[in-house]
């Protein structure tokens, strides 16, 4: 074990004497370097603060001059917090004496993590009232919000820490502050079921505002199923009749899909209907002109008799819940499409794939019409289709009875996936560049869909449609992680892992072949200057390497580390013996290598296209 690791472990475990022994006879410069170095992303002081080793913390600051503000990575409840300063870690873990010591040695009370979380917010999150009081006494700013605009008061309300919320309010916390998505502390109480804190917020002047989705605290409580909040707010004088009706209807939908309590749902729907009929002239509900096939053409019930009849048809009740939720929340709210997808998954689990696909396509329509390009929710929907189609194809291959996958079904989802890439890359400026992680995920999903399509028989017309779509996809020139083109991804084993369930296995010779046929650039480069051939070599796949070579790639072109594809082949694998460099090296390649090796001046002496060729061998 090296000295850096030994020092880190001693600090983490609170072994002061061992740490002193490790550092004896070390120069001040060596000690300072050890204090600033990170192991697993954390400094010794950060670890000692995280685990509450007071004597060790003071030794590190006083005798080792450990940097008191230097942040790092620290784990809480399985989540890695990046850029956390020692004071944040001590506050989150509830170590008051360590907090006092750090502040006494000059730690900034408002220093934040990478997500802009303060030590005060960390203490509020886990309910450490004594630390909250101490930090506020030492000028902690109550109103510093995290990157989502979520304040200390909001998190205290959401976590149900009544005493902390009361303390913050008494110290002047803004009771009506809004987050980035427009929600207030009242919304956090509603979503967590914290009724007593909600009553306190109202006494301090909290107002019932709508968030960015148009949700009031009452509707938020209905969505999360907190009946205590719904009962309280439906009787509150700030709540109008229309909102009371919507809240009860929405709560009934929550009872169907979240609590799986159909009888409970009926009771809330009856209460809503009684209120609606009590004001018939102004509370009439608008009906859609055409029933939605995805909902099996169901319509919302409008009379008490129709409502009573639902108990005999649980499936119709579930469609009622989806109809009600879409009407009240609208298609842009995440819960609307989420529960449509949830209901479709239940149908798939029972073998009713047709109903599942109809519902999922309807949810995908909503997402692509209302969400930003490359939304994680849209990507999740597209991945679910790929996983479902893979499962259905496996059943067919095993000879099991069940619905088969048609070429048209798969092709439609491929087209929808390509559309999502188009939406992302063709956004009008100054829109931000597409998120590389989400773009990479969607590119991988598309390759899995192409792989599944290659397993299905198709007519010449269908094959032409497929290849035109792939050509359109390639023309977008979208790249994923590390600048990987679709062809890079097709020959990389990491593309296999796109979700929780297996879809296709990569590297895929079939997918690489159809991409090349449709115009993929065989000499495209990633950010490390690797060609697809380099990636295929790293994966020890000689058949794909031969395919790429026959497609015109330069066998001896080098990457940023001056490595050829042959250099990357595993010497212990058979691939090395199957790929013979002499068979794929031209005189032109040898000449280019000689120019590079002897550092000959060639720019301006040869045609520009040959200059580019020489650069491939640098």
Curated annotation (Swiss-Prot):
Pfam families referenced in this protein's UniProt entry, alphabetically: Ank_2, Ank_4
PROSITE patterns reported in the protein's UniProt record: ANK_REP_REGION (PS50297), ANK_REPEAT (PS50088)
Keyword RNA-binding: no
Repeat region (TPR), residues: 245-279, 337-370
Quaternary data: Component of a CRL2 E3 ubiquitin-protein ligase complex, also named ECS (Elongin BC-CUL2/5-SOCS-box protein) complex.
Family: Belongs to the fem-1 family.
Protein name, entry field: Protein fem-1 homolog C
Organism this protein belongs to: Danio rerio
Taxonomic placement: Eukaryota, Metazoa, Chordata, Craniata, Vertebrata
């Amino acid at each position: 074990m090296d000295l850096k690791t030994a020092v880190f472990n001693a600090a983490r475990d609170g072994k002061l004497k061992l740490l002193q022994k490790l550092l004896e006879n070390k120069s001040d410069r060596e000690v300072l370097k050890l204090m600033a170095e990170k192991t697993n992303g954390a400094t010794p002081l950060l670890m000692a603060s995280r685990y509450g080793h007071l004597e060790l913390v003071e030794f590190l600051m006083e005798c080792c001059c450990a940097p008191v503000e230097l942040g790092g990575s620290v784990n809480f409840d399985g989540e890695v917090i990046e850029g956390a300063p020692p004071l944040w870690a001590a506050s989150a873990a509830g170590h008051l004496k360590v907090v006092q010591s750090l502040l006494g040695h000059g730690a900034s009370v408002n220093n934040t993590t990478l997500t802009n979380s303060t030590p005060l917010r960390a203490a509020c999150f886990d309910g450490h009232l004594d630390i909250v009081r101490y930090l506020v006494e030492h000028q902690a700013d109550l109103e510093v919000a995290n990157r989502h605009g979520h304040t200390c008061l909001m998190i205290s309300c959401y976590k149900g820490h009544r005493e902390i919320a009361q303390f913050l309010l008494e110290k002047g916390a803004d009771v009506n502050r809004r987050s980035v998505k427009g929600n207030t502390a009242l919304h956090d109480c509603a979503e967590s079921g914290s009724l007593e804190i909600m009553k306190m917020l109202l006494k301090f002047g909290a107002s019932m505002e709508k968030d960015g989705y148009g949700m009031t605290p009452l509707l938020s409580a209905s969505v999360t199923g907190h009946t205590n909040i719904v009962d309280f707010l439906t009787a509150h004088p700030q709540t109008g009749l229309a909102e009371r009706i919507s809240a009860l209807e929405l709560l009934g939908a929550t009872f169907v899909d979240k609590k799986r309590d159909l009888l409970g749902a009926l009771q809330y729907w009856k209460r809503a209907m009684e209120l609606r009929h009590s004001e018939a002239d102004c509370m009439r509900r608008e009906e859609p002109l055409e029933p939605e096939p995805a909902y099996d053409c169901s319509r919302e019930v409008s009379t008490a008799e129709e409502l009573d009849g639902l108990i005999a048809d649980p499936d119709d009740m579930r469609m009622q819940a989806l109809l009600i939720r879409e009407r009240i929340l609208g298609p842009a709210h995440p819960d609307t499409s989420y529960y449509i997808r949830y209901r479709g998954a239940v149908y798939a689990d029972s073998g009713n794939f047709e109903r599942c696909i109809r519902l999922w396509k309807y949810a995908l329509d909503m997402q692509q019409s209302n969400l930003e390009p490359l939304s994680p929710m849209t990507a999740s929907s597209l991945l679910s289709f790929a996983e479902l189609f893979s499962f259905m194809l496996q059943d067919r291959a095993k000879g099991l009875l069940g619905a088969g996958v048609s070429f048209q079904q798969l092709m439609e989802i491929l087209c929808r996936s390509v559309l999502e890439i188009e939406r992302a890359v063709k956004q009008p400026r100054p829109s931000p560049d597409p998120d590389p992680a989400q773009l990479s995920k969607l590119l991988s999903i598309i390759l899995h869909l192409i792989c599944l399509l290659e397993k299905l028989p198709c007519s010449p017309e269908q094959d032409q449609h497929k290849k035109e779509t792939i050509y359109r996809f390639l023309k977008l020139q979208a790249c994923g992680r590390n600048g990987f083109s679709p062809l890079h991804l097709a020959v990389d084993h990491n593309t296999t892992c796109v979700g929780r369930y297996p879809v296709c296995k990569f590297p895929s010779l079939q997918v690489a072949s159809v991409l090349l046929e449709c115009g993929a650039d065989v000499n495209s480069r990633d950010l490390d200057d690797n060609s697809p051939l380099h990636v295929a070599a790293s994966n020890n796949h000689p058949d794909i390497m031969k395919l790429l070579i026959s497609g015109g790639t330069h066998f001896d072109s080098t990457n940023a580390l001056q490595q050829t594809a042959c250099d990357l082949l595993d010497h212990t694998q058979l691939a090395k013996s199957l790929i013979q460099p002499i068979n794929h090296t031209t005189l032109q390649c040898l000449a280019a290598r000689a120019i590079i090796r002897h550092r000959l001046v060639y720019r301006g002496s040869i045609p520009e296209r040959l200059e580019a060729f020489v650069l491939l061998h640098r």
